């Protein structure tokens, strides 16, 4: 992996030298827009189709959605999987999920039973919790919610079964559909490709069966596709700096008549709530106009440690953020000693060669829900870090994070020029202390030798 990183660095230098700065930045922006995340380089959602049984005109399929992302999850209202049938196939039966519409099934009126769905492009949704046992399958019925691998590995997979039939005039063999979409803003999917058949364990692992055929489609996330504007911002402060560095002005937009002013009641009753659609944020009026603000405060300086307080505040009057998470990039996170009131996991996507990224999330039933804007619409933690004497300093804004993400979306940071700085007296006092210390050592050395001569 070290060799790969070195090769990547060399390629970057070469590209910088042969391309103009503008063209190079356009290329980097395209990589980001296409869904590459350097903090989670292997993150993706995989749609897997397993053909379990097949007979002329009828095919039994298991479809699985697996969230392979470390910290980005699919929250309510959940995924809505759709695709395009190539030969007007129909879905006769489903378990673990259902289509949102049946469509026109008049071609099968004489068959006695109508198919579950006859649409050329069906939209499938997960069943809700509490669905009848006779329609459940393993890993179903969570309302389309997919947790991230780091935060809740047990619930990062959804699955359903269906029986696919041919149209009256269509071919009898099974054909994979195309043009997949999971119905979550920011995600784009490629077409399915054939992979090695999935193997299933039975009889407590003593026997393995396998699918007749397996295909996979990959979906990746891009924040640029998800939203035209950012969703969070960062403010900074420190014990040695008298002012708070606020979020940059208009980080997520500029003030308008759509925000909620102090003393006003949020327009809950005026909002049209579709349970199958995410509610648009209505934020409290502020200079930054972001639904979420993250505040990083350098709180205490000890001899061998230092302490930071992190606060996430919800300015969105329309939404509680369930199972929220934060991802922070800072070089001293490799020396985290203790995290109070949050869960914490170090993220090392490059095989432990770099350990400067950490993920924070709430404790279940305590602070795993960030409530809507109000007096209790915040969560906070403190973390204790051991000083790395090789590079630790409070100078030049080193104590502040390089990047912060909330629920997988990049937050707008203040400019490094605006970071809290040590007062000039601290620089001069440290220099004076060094001089005084040196003079004291020399004085003690001379005094010792004078006493020996006496």
Curated annotation (Swiss-Prot):
It is found in: Cell membrane. GO terms for biological process: cellulose microfibril organization. Keywords: Cell membrane, Glycoprotein, GPI-anchor, Lipoprotein, Membrane, Signal. The keyword Cytoplasm does not apply. Residues 430-454 form a propeptide. A lipid is attached at residue 429 (GPI-anchor amidated serine). Expressed in flowers and siliques. This is COBRA-like protein 6. InterPro entries: COB_C, COBRA_pln. Its main location: membrane. It is a lipid-anchor; GPI-anchor. It holds the Pfam family COB_C. Residues 1-24 form the signal peptide. The keyword Lipoprotein applies. Belongs to the COBRA family. Glycans are attached at residues 104, 191, 320, 355, 391. It comes from Arabidopsis thaliana. It comes from the Eukaryota. One of its GO terms (cellular component) is plasma membrane.
């Amino acid at each position: 992996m070290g060799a790969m990183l070195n090769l990547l660095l060399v390629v970057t230098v070469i590209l910088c030298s042969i391309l103009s700065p503008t063209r190079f930045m356009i290329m980097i922006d395209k990589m980001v827009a296409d869904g590459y995340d350097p903090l989670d380089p292997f993150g993706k959602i995989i749609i897997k189709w397993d053909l379990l049984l097949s007979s002329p005109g009828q095919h039994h399929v298991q479809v699985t959605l697996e969230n392979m992302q470390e910290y980005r999850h699919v929250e309510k209202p959940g995924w809505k999987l759709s695709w395009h049938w190539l030969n007007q196939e129909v879905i006769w039966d489903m378990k673990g999920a259902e289509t949102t519409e049946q469509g026109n099934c008049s071609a099968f009126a004489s068959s006695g039973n109508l198919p579950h769905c006859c649409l050329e492009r069906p939209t499938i949704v997960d069943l809700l919790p509490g669905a009848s046992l006779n329609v459940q399958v393993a890993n179903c019925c969570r309302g389309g919610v997919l947790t991230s691998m780091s935060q809740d590995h047990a619930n990062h997979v959804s699955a359903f079964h269906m029986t696919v039939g041919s149209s009256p005039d269509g071919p009898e063999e099974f054909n994979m559909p195309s043009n997949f979409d999971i119905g979550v803003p920011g995600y784009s999917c490629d077409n399915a490709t054939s992979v090695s058949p999935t193997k299933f364990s039975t009889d407590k692992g003593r026997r393995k069966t396998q699918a007749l055929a397996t295909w996979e489609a990959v979906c990746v996330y891009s924040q640029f596709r998800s939203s035209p504007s950012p969703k969070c911002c960062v403010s900074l402060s420190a014990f040695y700096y008298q002012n708070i560095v606020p979020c940059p002005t208009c980080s997520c937009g500029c003030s308008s008549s759509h925000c909620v002013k102090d003393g006003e009641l949020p327009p809950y009753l005026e909002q049209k709530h579709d349970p199958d659609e995410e509610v648009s944020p209505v934020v409290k009026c502020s200079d930054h106009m972001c639904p979420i603000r993250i505040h990083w405060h350098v709180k205490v300086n000890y001899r061998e440690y230092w302490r930071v307080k992190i606060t996430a505040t919800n300015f969105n009057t329309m939404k509680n953020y369930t199972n929220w998470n934060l991802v922070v990039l800072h070089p001293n996170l490799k020396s985290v000693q203790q995290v109070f009131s949050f869960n914490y996991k170090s993220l090392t996507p490059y095989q432990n060669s770099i350990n400067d990224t950490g993920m924070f999330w709430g404790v279940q039933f305590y602070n795993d829900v960030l409530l809507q804007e109000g007096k209790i619409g915040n969560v906070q933690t403190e973390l204790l870090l051991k000083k790395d004497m090789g590079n630790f300093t409070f100078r030049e804004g080193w104590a502040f994070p390089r990047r912060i993400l909330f629920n997988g979306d990049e937050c707008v940071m203040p400019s490094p020029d605006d970071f809290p700085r040590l007062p000039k007296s601290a620089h001069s006092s440290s220099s004076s202390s060094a001089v005084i210390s040196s003079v004291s050592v020399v004085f003690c050395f001379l005094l010792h030798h004078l006493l020996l001569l006496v």
